[in-house]
């Protein structure tokens, strides 16, 4: 799918760090099998890849399905590789009646540097959104955990969400620091 060369002061972030799958030594982003229950309370699960047909475009793509059991029921999100292999992002979210997401970016993929920030333009439910990812801690090896900041802005540039995430090899997401935004 995507094969990426790595040089000094940067690191390849594999898709398997997001899914909790076994991390390979190569630098290719590919859809490997995932079936992982994770999180402190073991209420989150990621499975895939599976085929999903976008109801707006009719196009079928490979996705991972992530679910979370919560007080308000089951939340389901579908993720795929986006932004020319720079991210894995949501394409669908069950909340608020279900939303199609275009050009989502929820987790960095491929070559990144510690301290690097990248911005991505997309939409959620037809509303324009900007996403900003900043690598906070990277490590040197593909099996090292990754900590990053994820910010979501609305079409006018107002900050809507600001979270720090940590993902660890074989475990998927291991920490979420939700910085409450005053609305």
Language model regions located:
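Bacterial N-terminal signal peptides
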Residues: 1-2
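Generic detection of short hydrophobic beta-strand segments and adjacent strand-loop junctions
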Residues: 79, 118-120, 165
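An acidic-aromatic
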Residues: 71-104
